[in-house]
Amino acid sequence: KDYKECAKKFIESHYAFDSESVLFKPTFTKEVIFRNSKDMALSYFIGGNIEEDHGFALKPWEKISIDELNILEENKLSIAMGILKLKPVNSDKITSVAFTFVFTETNSSLKIKVHHSSPL
């Protein structure tokens, strides 16, 4: 499969970039902190036009689990907040990440409007 096309489809189906403004603060960013466009999000996930991007989605993750999941539904928004535990392949080092997702309904599906995640 073409990983670039898969990543584009993932972003289009999970993030609201095509219908409204999105705020995106990925987990492992230091130089360009926010990725508030589809092209910048794509660069974060598969590498591209931002030097620090090495492709979060291309890294071989063995396991990703969620702890302390909190969910809030108000008006037309749904919000999820918790901790992700990321375990790479061939490593015992687990990275804990605090995350917040704000979802909005677009064309009868939920999509991410705000994504913030930071290592703990």
Features from the language model and the residues they span:
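Generic structural motif recognizing short loop/turn segments at the entrances and edges of beta-strands
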Residues: 18-20, 38, 60-62, 92-95, ...
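Short non-domain terminal segments
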Residues: 8, 22, 43, 54, ...
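Histidine (H) residue identity feature
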Residues: 14, 54, 115-116
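Short beta-strand edge/turn micro-motifs at domain boundaries
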Residues: 73-81, 85, 90-120
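Core segments of small alpha/beta cavity-forming domains
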Residues: 1-46
